[in-house]
């Protein structure tokens, strides 16, 4: 694949690169510039534009293309505006220049995660409007802040507000991930993030002595139990070629804390873990297992949750789901191979599904290495434009799904 020269660049690519240059990078994203960008785009496309401040400085921008039948539920196209930090010294090009090389690869933070999808939504709508189309169902595009740090000042708040309920969303699309093969990954559920801190208390003393009942000994037992569970899940994944990473529960030890000096046995030590719990796990039983590992380690060992998502939802991927039927039929007609999976990490889709809206995670990037959050994140312009083509076919099908019992 080779690149067109600047004078021949596709206008959709130009808009994509313009958006990539907006520095919505954590921890201090320029959300104001992103909101202004979408306001201007809405004006150009003749779309309704609503700004909802869900927390001070955190604005959800909603662009609306009204359908012909307001009694039907709407299609929600969601994307987040923030991107993760960069280490510029490890990049071949400025991560906020949106540099395009001679082969057509666009280097930028957010190229895959997920500014490409935001512009693909907009450009598909632009194309359909220019062609004179209208569809029964209203299409809303939501551009939300804060996803990369948990969405707690973004979609988590937005779904609780009357402005969200007024959208009457019947089905949603949000981000997926690149796929290095010919296939396209589509996520129908997500693992639940549990951030767990285990604290162990014990006898302090001089570090030259063999003390009993120390905090470190008891914490060591819990760490061993959790890492043994990790190995068991890893082996289960490795031994079954039909399982994907999202189908098992992962855990990583991410932080160890304790101690004040080399020669002092600490009275308190702690270990922090990031669990991603598969949706088919019995959450109550799993929490009891964690508690039992702490109890088995001895007295004075406790756990607390920094994050604990308890609402796993699965969007059906069979013909019992009319949204999936419409989505998959278009992909079949376009000769796109789909690989339905459980999202290993967490996205804003978990908040959308939790309020009863079926949702899929889909970023149309096949034959593309997975580079989200990585150095030299990039996307080929041809892959990006193919994504616009795909949404241009998907949106009419989704927005034309016949009336459903849930619409009332």
From Swiss-Prot:
One of its GO terms (biological process) is amino acid metabolic process. It is linked to Aminoacylase-1 deficiency: An enzymatic deficiency resulting in encephalopathy, unspecific psychomotor delay, psychomotor delay with atrophy of the vermis and syringomyelia, marked muscular hypotonia or normal clinical features. Epileptic seizures are a frequent feature. All affected individuals exhibit markedly increased urinary excretion of several N-acetylated amino acids. Pfam families: M20_dimer, Peptidase_M20. GO terms for molecular function: aminoacylase activity; identical protein binding; metal ion binding. Changing residue 381 to D: In a breast cancer sample; somatic mutation. The active site is at residues 82, 147. It catalyses: an N-acyl-L-amino acid + H2O = an L-alpha-amino acid + a carboxylate; N-acetyl-L-methionine + H2O = L-methionine + acetate; N-acetyl-L-glutamine + H2O = L-glutamine + acetate. Changing residue 378 to W: In ACY1D; slightly reduced activity. It comes from Homo sapiens (Human). Catalyzes the hydrolysis of N-acetylated amino acids to acetate and free amino acids. Its main location: cytoplasm. Zn(2+) 1 binds at residues 80, 113, 175. Binds 2 Zn(2+) ions per subunit. CDD domains: M20_AcylaseI_like. Zn(2+) 2 binds at residues 113, 148, 373. Keywords: Cytoplasm, Disease variant, Hydrolase, Metal-binding, Zinc. Homodimer. Interacts with SPHK1. Changing residue 206 to N: Almost abolishes enzyme activity. It is an enzyme of class 3 (hydrolase). It is found in: Cytoplasm. GO terms for cellular component: cytosol; extracellular exosome. Gene3D superfamilies: 1.10.150.900, 3.30.70.360, Zn peptidases (3.40.630.10). Its EC number is 3.5.1.14. This is Aminoacylase-1. Expression is highest in kidney, strong in brain and weaker in placenta and spleen. Its cofactor is Zn(2+). Belongs to the peptidase M20A family.
């Amino acid at each position: 694949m080779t690149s067109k020269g600047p004078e021949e660049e596709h206008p959709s690519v130009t808009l994509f690169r313009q958006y990539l240059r907006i520095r919505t990078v954590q921890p201090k994203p320029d959300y104001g510039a992103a909101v202004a960008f979408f306001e201007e785009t809405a004006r150009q496309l003749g779309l309704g534009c609503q700004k909802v401040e869900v927390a001070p400085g955190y604005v959800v921008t909603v662009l609306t293309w009204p359908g012909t039948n307001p009694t039907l539920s709407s299609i929600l196209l969601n994307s987040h505006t923030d991107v993760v930090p960069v280490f510029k010294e490890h990049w071949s090009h400025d991560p906020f220049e949106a540099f395009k090389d001679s082969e057509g690869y666009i280097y930028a933070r957010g190229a895959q995660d997920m500014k490409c999808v935001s512009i693909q939504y907009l450009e598909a709508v632009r194309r359909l409007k220019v062609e004179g189309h209208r569809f029964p169902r209203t299409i809303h595009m939501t551009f939300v802040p804060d996803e990369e740090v948990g969405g707690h000042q973004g979609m988590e708040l937005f779904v609780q507000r009357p402005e969200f309920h007024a959208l009457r969303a019947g089905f949603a699309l949000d981000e997926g991930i690149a796929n290095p093969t010919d296939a396209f990954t589509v996520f129908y559920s997500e693992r639940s993030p549990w951030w767990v801190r285990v604290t162990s208390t014990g006898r302090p003393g001089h570090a030259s002595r063999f003390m009993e009942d120390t905090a470190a000994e008891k914490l060591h037992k819990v760490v061993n139990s959790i890492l043994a569970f990790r190995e068991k899940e890893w082996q289960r994944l490795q031994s079954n070629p039909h399982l994907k990473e999202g189908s098992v529960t992962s855990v990583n030890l991410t932080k160890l804390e304790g101690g004040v000096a080399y020669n002092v046995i600490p009275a308190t030590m702690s270990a922090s873990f990031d669990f991603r719990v598969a949706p088919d796990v019995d959450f109550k039983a799993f929490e009891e297992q964690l508690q039992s590992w702490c109890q088995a380690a001895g007295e004075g060992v406790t756990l607390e949750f920094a994050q604990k998502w308890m609402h796993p939802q699965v969007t059906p991927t069979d013909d019992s789901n009319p949204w999936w039927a419409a989505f998959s039929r278009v992909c079949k007609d376009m000769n796109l191979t789909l690989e339905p999976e459980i999202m290993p990490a967490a996205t804003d889709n978990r908040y959308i599904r939790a309020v009863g809206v079926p949702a899929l995670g889909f970023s149309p990037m096949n034959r593309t290495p997975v580079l989200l959050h990585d150095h030299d994140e990039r996307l080929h312009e041809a892959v990006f434009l193919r994504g616009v083509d795909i949404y241009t076919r998907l949106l009419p099908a989704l927005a034309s799904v016949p009336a459903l019992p849930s619409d009332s």
